[in-house]
Amino acid sequence: MPGMNVLALETSTDAGSCALLLEGRVSERICPAGRPHSETLLPLLRELMAEHGVGFAQLDAIAFGAGPGAFTGLRVACGIAQGLAVAVALPVVPVCGLEAMAATVGEARVLSLLDAHMGEVYAGAYVHGEGGQELQSEICLASPEAVELPADAGWVACGNAPA
Protein backbone atom coordinates (compact mmCIF):
# COMPACT_ATOMS: atom_id res chain seq x y z
CA MET A 1 0.00 0.00 0.00
CA PRO A 2 2.46 2.69 -1.08
CA GLY A 3 1.39 6.18 -0.11
CA MET A 4 -1.03 4.93 2.53
CA ASN A 5 -0.68 5.38 6.27
CA VAL A 6 -1.93 2.26 8.06
CA LEU A 7 -2.00 1.16 11.67
CA ALA A 8 -1.89 -2.65 12.01
CA LEU A 9 -2.72 -4.75 15.08
CA GLU A 10 -1.95 -8.45 15.60
CA THR A 11 -2.99 -10.45 18.66
CA SER A 12 -4.07 -13.81 17.23
CA THR A 13 -0.81 -15.54 18.28
CA ASP A 14 1.45 -15.53 21.34
CA ALA A 15 3.52 -12.71 19.82
CA GLY A 16 1.18 -9.73 19.71
CA SER A 17 2.27 -6.56 17.96
CA CYS A 18 1.32 -3.26 16.43
CA ALA A 19 2.88 -1.65 13.38
CA LEU A 20 2.64 1.66 11.62
CA LEU A 21 3.09 2.04 7.86
CA LEU A 22 3.85 5.72 7.45
CA GLU A 23 5.01 7.27 4.19
CA GLY A 24 6.32 3.91 2.96
CA ARG A 25 8.24 3.03 6.14
CA VAL A 26 7.24 0.48 8.76
CA SER A 27 7.79 0.77 12.52
CA GLU A 28 6.62 -1.84 15.00
CA ARG A 29 6.24 -2.74 18.64
CA ILE A 30 6.07 -6.28 20.04
CA CYS A 31 3.91 -7.05 23.08
CA PRO A 32 5.97 -8.27 26.08
CA ALA A 33 5.83 -12.03 26.58
CA GLY A 34 3.78 -13.33 29.47
CA ARG A 35 1.34 -10.43 29.65
CA PRO A 36 -2.13 -10.35 28.09
CA HIS A 37 -2.38 -8.52 24.78
CA SER A 38 -5.45 -6.76 26.17
CA GLU A 39 -3.16 -5.01 28.70
CA THR A 40 -0.18 -4.29 26.47
CA LEU A 41 -1.45 -3.44 23.00
CA LEU A 42 -3.00 0.00 23.59
CA PRO A 43 0.02 1.42 25.49
CA LEU A 44 2.34 0.16 22.73
CA LEU A 45 0.07 1.64 20.07
CA ARG A 46 0.08 5.04 21.80
CA GLU A 47 3.88 4.90 22.18
CA LEU A 48 4.37 4.02 18.51
CA MET A 49 2.12 6.79 17.24
CA ALA A 50 3.59 9.38 19.63
CA GLU A 51 7.13 8.46 18.57
CA HIS A 52 6.23 9.33 14.98
CA GLY A 53 4.03 12.31 15.82
CA VAL A 54 1.06 10.68 14.12
CA GLY A 55 -2.57 11.18 15.00
CA PHE A 56 -5.51 9.09 13.85
CA ALA A 57 -6.51 11.85 11.41
CA GLN A 58 -3.33 11.08 9.43
CA LEU A 59 -4.21 7.41 8.98
CA ASP A 60 -5.92 5.96 5.91
CA ALA A 61 -6.94 2.64 7.48
CA ILE A 62 -6.60 0.31 10.45
CA ALA A 63 -5.69 -3.33 9.75
CA PHE A 64 -5.92 -6.25 12.14
CA GLY A 65 -4.81 -9.87 12.15
CA ALA A 66 -7.99 -11.81 11.39
CA GLY A 67 -6.50 -15.19 12.15
CA PRO A 68 -6.36 -17.99 12.17
CA GLY A 69 -5.44 -18.00 15.82
CA ALA A 70 -6.64 -17.85 19.39
CA PHE A 71 -10.25 -16.69 19.61
CA THR A 72 -9.61 -14.37 22.57
CA GLY A 73 -6.62 -12.85 20.82
CA LEU A 74 -8.59 -12.31 17.62
CA ARG A 75 -11.24 -10.43 19.58
CA VAL A 76 -8.65 -8.10 21.16
CA ALA A 77 -7.22 -6.81 17.85
CA CYS A 78 -10.58 -6.82 16.08
CA GLY A 79 -12.31 -4.97 18.92
CA ILE A 80 -9.61 -2.33 19.24
CA ALA A 81 -9.43 -1.86 15.45
CA GLN A 82 -13.20 -1.50 15.13
CA GLY A 83 -13.49 0.82 18.12
CA LEU A 84 -10.75 3.13 16.89
CA ALA A 85 -12.00 3.05 13.30
CA VAL A 86 -15.56 3.96 14.28
CA ALA A 87 -14.31 6.80 16.48
CA VAL A 88 -12.26 8.37 13.68
CA ALA A 89 -14.21 7.16 10.60
CA LEU A 90 -11.51 4.94 9.09
CA PRO A 91 -11.91 1.70 7.14
CA VAL A 92 -10.96 -1.57 8.86
CA VAL A 93 -8.95 -4.12 6.87
CA PRO A 94 -8.87 -7.75 8.08
CA VAL A 95 -5.62 -9.55 7.20
CA CYS A 96 -5.17 -13.34 7.19
CA GLY A 97 -1.94 -14.14 9.04
CA LEU A 98 -1.13 -17.16 6.89
CA GLU A 99 -1.56 -15.13 3.71
CA ALA A 100 0.56 -12.27 5.08
CA MET A 101 3.36 -14.69 5.97
CA ALA A 102 3.26 -16.27 2.51
CA ALA A 103 3.50 -12.83 0.88
CA THR A 104 6.81 -12.09 2.62
CA VAL A 105 8.62 -15.25 1.52
CA GLY A 106 9.25 -14.30 -2.10
CA GLU A 107 8.70 -17.82 -3.48
CA ALA A 108 6.11 -19.01 -5.99
CA ARG A 109 4.64 -21.78 -3.81
CA VAL A 110 4.43 -21.30 -0.06
CA LEU A 111 2.95 -23.42 2.71
CA SER A 112 2.28 -21.18 5.73
CA LEU A 113 2.15 -22.95 9.10
CA LEU A 114 1.20 -21.50 12.48
CA ASP A 115 1.43 -23.39 15.77
CA ALA A 116 -2.13 -23.85 17.05
CA HIS A 117 -0.82 -25.58 20.20
CA MET A 118 -1.95 -28.96 21.54
CA GLY A 119 -0.20 -30.76 18.68
CA GLU A 120 -2.00 -28.98 15.84
CA VAL A 121 -1.13 -26.39 13.21
CA TYR A 122 -3.03 -23.94 11.04
CA ALA A 123 -1.98 -24.43 7.41
CA GLY A 124 -2.57 -22.60 4.14
CA ALA A 125 -0.95 -23.25 0.75
CA TYR A 126 -0.49 -20.20 -1.50
CA VAL A 127 0.68 -19.77 -5.10
CA HIS A 128 2.04 -16.36 -6.14
CA GLY A 129 1.18 -15.14 -9.61
CA GLU A 130 0.88 -11.91 -11.58
CA GLY A 131 -2.40 -11.00 -9.89
CA GLY A 132 -1.14 -11.65 -6.36
CA GLN A 133 -1.37 -14.85 -4.38
CA GLU A 134 -4.07 -17.46 -4.43
CA LEU A 135 -5.06 -19.91 -1.70
CA GLN A 136 -4.87 -23.44 -3.14
CA SER A 137 -7.21 -25.16 -0.67
CA GLU A 138 -9.15 -24.32 2.46
CA ILE A 139 -7.10 -23.19 5.45
CA CYS A 140 -7.02 -26.15 7.82
CA LEU A 141 -6.41 -27.01 11.46
CA ALA A 142 -4.68 -30.38 11.67
CA SER A 143 -1.82 -32.34 13.15
CA PRO A 144 1.45 -31.55 11.35
CA GLU A 145 1.48 -35.07 9.90
CA ALA A 146 -1.98 -34.60 8.37
CA VAL A 147 -1.12 -31.42 6.44
CA GLU A 148 -1.02 -32.24 2.74
CA LEU A 149 0.82 -30.27 0.08
CA PRO A 150 -0.62 -29.95 -3.39
CA ALA A 151 0.78 -32.63 -5.74
CA ASP A 152 3.17 -30.39 -7.71
CA ALA A 153 6.77 -29.83 -6.52
CA GLY A 154 8.67 -26.74 -5.42
CA TRP A 155 6.90 -25.81 -2.18
CA VAL A 156 8.60 -23.79 0.58
CA ALA A 157 7.32 -23.75 4.17
CA CYS A 158 7.24 -20.73 6.48
CA GLY A 159 5.90 -20.00 9.96
CA ASN A 160 6.43 -21.05 13.55
CA ALA A 161 5.09 -24.61 13.36
CA PRO A 162 6.63 -27.93 12.36
CA ALA A 163 5.82 -29.17 8.86
Which stretches of residues belong to each language-model region?
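Residues at secondary-structure transition points
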Residues: 32-40, 71, 75, 79, ...
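DPxDG-like acidic metal-binding loop motif
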Residues: 63-92
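Phosphate-handling active-site elements
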Residues: 50-57, 85-96
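Active-site phosphate/pyrophosphate- and oxyanion-stabilizing loops and adjacent acidic/basic residues
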Residues: 46, 82, 99-100
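N-terminal beta-alpha supersecondary unit
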Residues: 2-66
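Surface "functional belts" at beta-alpha junctions
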Residues: 1-3, 36, 90-163
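Glycine-rich nucleotide phosphate-binding loop and flanking beta-alpha elements
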Residues: 15, 70, 120
